């Protein structure tokens, strides 16, 4: 499969656009959004659905290599924007969950969760030529994570349990990764103190969550041990940090946890991730994102810029990460930018029509900003269509097309699942112009962002199926981005944050509904000038149970609409 087949650009367009946030020209193929647009594999059993999760990503010999659970292979990229899929048959444990990789010298090492630990290596991972290492590490690893320190010492971390702690041990890569000493318990469960560790859709269940998916990052001489909680099936799945002065601790809880967290927006979840540096020195976090409708493990991958500094600590930019943002080709200060290109969502709950629909899968599900719901036509025949009315002509920059694979009967192994379609725009609903023509498409891209070379002013947008399909033509998101021509909402009034008197992990928020607002961004942090966490809310009230019991918090709220915020 050629690398060019995975570039996230419209094949009929090329060139650059100007970012509204930076004022700089950005190549189209570097404008992306979440979930990552990968050829997510359908699983071999149960209800037909795609899955990828528990990602790990490292830069090795000029390429980024991305591995994820249940993917039948892995991906590589030169720029974090376009991805080439590499099917893999030479790693017999590839189908086990939670892979980890480690570059040492000219070799990339791999292992995963399995009954008996087995490590593999490959000096040329662009080829499926992995070889087994004579593995001497005897611990049974669940959610393993390699880490190589600057002094050449190598460590293994692991843990995936609602009872057992996150563990760690030094290993010897020159002797089959044999453990050097006894493993140490590093992170225990504390759901009684840290609300975000409590399971449930809103952290409401009276039991311990799962602490899992560790990852180690070193910054300015200190060791940041990351872990995920409380469960992969929840939008409130996130990653937190403990910090210490040595690779095996002792570690202290970071008060501003979780550092990677995305409970709201089109797609939620930002847990069981891996933090890495790109070739320019920028930090990124790749993590699991959640659908969990057809199966608890129905998941996708997300990529988030991460700010790392001695002043502000570590935090991932997530709240606007399912809007268009750009992949930089230079060093960037992520304390000053989240890489957004400045386009607003124009399509939220606008009038929608369709050629047909199934009960429970009405057209409005395609623009309700919930990937968990979708529109499904009655058939997969050519000519099924969905149309959105922006209600007034607006400048459109991009369209995010998310296919839902409704009533598909696809199971691994399978050839690429290819959609063919075209997207039209109209100012009056009568005369239509072709914006994107994918009638000859040969790529498996279920979450593609289409970006125009120059914005077009249209009121109506329509996507039409052009290929006979065995299931139903279906969309979990037909999302239109650009610039409205009206006014942004006014400052939010009547904001109140009330802490529960009996359970201080819980806050309840209310505010006055603002005229013309699409939604609101609620921000918080443990320092007044450091509100690094955020959630998108489409109502004027919100309950959150993911706070620390003993921490004090500061909050702010802003309204947004199609004209800005």
Feature annotation, model-predicted:
Residues 18-19:
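C-terminal motif of bacterial Sec signal peptides marking the signal peptidase cleavage site
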Residues 327-393, 402-416, 437, 479-494, ...:
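Disordered, acidic Ser/Thr/Pro-rich linker "stalks" and the adjacent N-terminal cap
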Residues 381-382, 409-485, 545:
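Trp- and acidic/polar-enriched beta-sheet ligand-binding modules for extracellular glycan
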